[in-house]
From Swiss-Prot:
Residues 281-300 are annotated as: Disordered. Required for ovarian folliculogenesis. Keywords: Cleavage on pair of basic residues, Cytokine, Disulfide bond, Glycoprotein, Growth factor, Phosphoprotein, Secreted, Signal. One of its GO terms (cellular component) is cytoplasm. The gene is GDF9. Homodimer or heterodimer (Potential). But, in contrast to other members of this family, cannot be disulfide-linked. Residues 1-25 form the signal peptide. Disulfide bonds join 352-418, 381-450, 385-452. This is Growth/differentiation factor 9. Phosphorylated; phosphorylation is critical for GDF9 function. It comes from Bos taurus (Bovine). GO terms for molecular function: cytokine activity; growth factor activity. Gene3D superfamilies: Cystine-knot cytokines. The lineage of its organism: Eukaryota, Metazoa, Chordata, Craniata, Vertebrata.
């Protein structure tokens, strides 16, 4: 009988010891489920708020990157660009932007967008003659749906790329003949004759070349300005050897078969609010204009010059007397608490300042369409604002007034908050859904200074 009693006692002790462990484990799993459910609900609520926004109001409410986020976990582009075209745009990005992704300050041009389009349709019209240096005449169709109404053309270029870099031992003059064709017409409309533009360019192929740029701004500017969605052109590219200066070039053959179909480069200025406008940084705001009477050197006071001079002298004497009387007074009253006096000038330990927040676009699953930069540091402002906001924050007088109201009159009025005061732009190289490549500069993407407001 003693043995069963001992066994029963041992079993009860064991159950008592194990019971708290089971209780502790169950709440931990429950808390984890609650946290996960809360995170999912928060994310779903955020997405629902974004989806209910009208498309017409999105650009004013959401940042440029959130506009992309709104489009719904953006899928990879339907079409991938050519490797040579992508290599060219990466080279352009390095020339225009720093490693951190901000536009270089030494650039003086006014465009903030560069788009590269590959032809959506092409076919050869006539065979070429390699011995004569004539390439096959090519019909090209470019779709410009990605060009928005707020983007204005500065320059357009036909970009020829090579499979491998090539070089010639003698100078070569290349002539590009470009014919812009009208779209297909219905039977009711009368077709207009195509208009032709011929460009003469001389290239010195002494060095290795991977691409050739031909300026075609003149024929394309009216088409882009009228928002043509499709541009149909015929291109004929001919290179002539300089046989007078180099007789040995007479019997040599051109190796121009490596020249591929051209891409179309559009240098644009995006005038929207989200785009970075370099003109404002090159031309800072002017100071307020003076009064017309002040410009002419006249006094704004209705009195005569002598009376005005007397007023200034009397005011100067009063200022001197007030300063001397203030100097005679004791600096601090005897009953004044120095610790309380200096406390208002002390900055808090966690004072308002900039903090880094480095992320990579692969974390957001955006690296399938954002080519550069690979990492992004938007930075943010965090911390407490001091009672007496000094010049270091550049805060307005309104901030000090709000502090006084909060402490003396109404504590429900919030204290000044730590917020960004200045920003810098961000350069982004991205692949569009149609396979085109876009270099864009976005305004106010990186916080550079904090303030209390």
């Amino acid at each position: 009988m003693a043995l069963p009693n001992k066994f029963f006692l041992w079993f009860c002790c064991f159950a008592w010891l194990c019971f708290p462990i089971s209780l502790d484990s169950q709440p931990s799993r429950g808390e984890a489920q609650i946290v996960a459910r809360t995170a999912l609900e928060s994310e779903a609520e955020t997405w629902s708020l974004l989806k209910h926004l009208d498309g017409r109001h999105r650009p004013g409410l959401l940042s440029p990157l959130l506009n992309v986020l709104y489009d719904g976990h953006r899928e990879p582009p339907r079409l991938q660009p050519d490797d040579r075209a992508l290599s060219y745009m990466k080279r352009l990005y390095k020339a225009y932007a720093t490693k951190e992704g901000t536009p270089k300050s030494n650039r003086s041009h006014l465009y903030n967008t560069v788009r590269l389009f590959t032809p959506c349709a092409q076919h050869k019209q006539a065979p070429g003659d390699q011995a004569a240096g004539t390439l096959p005449s090519v019909d090209l169709l470019f779709n410009l749906d990605r060009v928005t109404v707020v983007e204005h053309l500065f320059k357009s270029v036909l970009l020829y790329t090579f499979n491998n870099s090539i070089s010639f031992p003698f100078p070569v003059k290349c002539i590009c003949n470009l014919v812009i064709k009208e779209p297909e017409f219905s039977s009711k409309t009368l077709p207009r004759a195509p208009y032709s533009f011929t460009f003469n360019s001389q290239f010195e192929f002494r060095k290795k070349y991977k691409w050739i740029e031909i300026d075609v701004t003149a024929p394309l500017e009216p088409l882009v300005a009228s928002h043509k969605r499709n541009i149909h052109m015929s291109v004929n590219f001919t290179c002539v050897k300089d046989q007078l200066q180099h007789p040995s070039a007479r019997d040599s053959l051109f190796n121009m078969t490596l020249l591929l179909a051209p891409s179309l480069l559009l240098y644009l200025n995006d005038t929207s609010a989200q785009a970075f406008h370099r003109w404002h940084s090159l031309h800072p705001k002017r100071k307020p204009s003076q009064d017309p009477d002040q410009k002419r050197g006249l006094s704004a006071c209705p009195m005569g010059e002598e009376a005005a001079e007397g007023v200034r002298l009397s005011r100067h004497r009063r200022d001197q007397e007030s300063v001397s009387s203030e100097l005679k007074k004791p600096l601090v009253p005897a009953s004044f608490n120095l610790s309380e006096y200096f406390k208002q000038f002390l900055f808090p330990q966690n004072e308002c300042e900039l903090h880094d927040f480095r992320l990579s676009f692969s974390q957001l699953k955006w690296d399938n369409w954002i080519v550069a930069p690979h990492k992004y540091n938007p930075r943010y402002c965090k911390g407490d604002c001091p009672r007496a906001v000094g010049h270091r924050y550049g805060s307005p007088v309104h901030t000090m007034v709000m502090n006084i109201i909060h402490e003396k009159l109404d504590s429900s009025v919030p204290r000044p908050s730590c917020v960004p005061a200045k920003y810098s732009p961000l350069s982004v190289l991205a692949i569009e859904p149609d396979g085109s490549i876009a270099y864009k500069e976005y305004e106010d993407m990186i916080a550079t200074k904090c303030t209390c407001r």
